[in-house]
């Protein structure tokens, strides 16, 4: 086998590989003979079909298969010999056979050489937060509101009330599509409607008819309404006030607490809040570390890896539409290219961190991650057992553990400052509610 390597552009490499033509001819001959022994063709006894007949019927397909196998095998031998690390599947272009040699070209991309830089320039503001008694009480108040019952009242509508109404919206005196509803129910203070709509209902009673003026946000989804001033003619049909359940053992029973009553509920709430806080704190620090790592390391990315990641993201997006992807048009790659490139770059950089620091997934950390995740389920032990019996899930958890270890390794050289933050403020920002 003779091999020449050409760097074409960027990460692309072109291998020209020559192998003795007799190598292919022998493999084709052997394959034809094997096929002749097992072929069943009318007019010939089993195992007695002439090779010339087999060659006429199947020769072209057999030669094509053999050629593909020869190219694949010799390509692998060539990249090992040349110490090349392909980042995607090669494209093979077979050449002509001159009787003595068979030549083909393999084109592919290689992984970039990654040299980590600026690790000591990464700046991280590490938030410190804890769950207080007041935070637990606030969560209980939220749960009370979620389990409230509503009854009609004869007073002005206030924040937290539910109201029922009929309304018609118009812009410049003309009704617009989607701007009309009957028997519409809305909880005031929920933020479901455009700014000013809910505020315009406050202070009105059931039976009143009134008009409110609002302006659609510039980022509103309907193009024809962006930034437009509108009027809504409203007929308020009912005002319903919330009746919150008392905080007692009966309230605790609503959440499956069969023993321990209210104290047991508070313990369970605190445990869940602590778990969510720990996850959010880790995610916050990780995002800062990753952002710093990306900013300080500019590397060339193999297009093959980006294309593969685009396909993954596209498939995930299609599944979010309900999994019915058969009759849906394919989403354009441009929607996912930027995110895909970022994910590829993160993977390459973290891979180098793992390699440089000789990191291996710690079994204790893997089991701790599984236990933390399982604690959110009714029967944690069953979830833990399921994960430990599933090779694919276990590999996913090892990857998560390795990522954590890589982030911790980067933190050792980063500029880290700690900042005390309140639980509610931090979690609101983490979940996008701030």
Curated annotation (Swiss-Prot):
Main location group: cytoplasm
Keywords recorded for this protein, A-Z: Cell cycle, Cell division, Chaperone, Cytoplasm, Isomerase, Rotamase
Pfam (any one): FKBP_C
Domain PPIase FKBP-type: 160-245
Subcellular location: Cytoplasm
Catalytic activity, as annotated: [protein]-peptidylproline (omega=180) = [protein]-peptidylproline (omega=0)
GO molecular-function term, one example from the UniProt record: protein folding chaperone
PROSITE patterns: FKBP_PPIASE (PS50059)
Keyword Ribonucleoprotein: no
Gene Ontology BP annotations: 'de novo' cotranslational protein folding; cell division; chaperone-mediated protein folding; protein transport; protein unfolding
Enzyme Commission designation: 5.2.1.8
GO cellular component: cytoplasm
InterPro entries: PPIase_dom_sf, PPIase_FKBP_dom, Trig_fac, Trigger_fac_C, Trigger_fac_C_sf, Trigger_fac_ribosome-bd_bac, Trigger_fac_ribosome-bd_sf, Trigger_fact/SurA_dom_sf
Similarity remark: Belongs to the FKBP-type PPIase family. Tig subfamily.
Chain's role: Involved in protein export. Acts as a chaperone by maintaining the newly synthesized protein in an open conformation. Functions as a peptidyl-prolyl cis-trans isomerase.
Domain observations: Consists of 3 domains; the N-terminus binds the ribosome, the middle domain has PPIase activity, while the C-terminus has intrinsic chaperone activity on its own.
Protein name: Trigger factor
Annotated organism of origin: Shewanella sp. (strain ANA-3)
Name of the gene encoding the protein in the UniProt record: tig
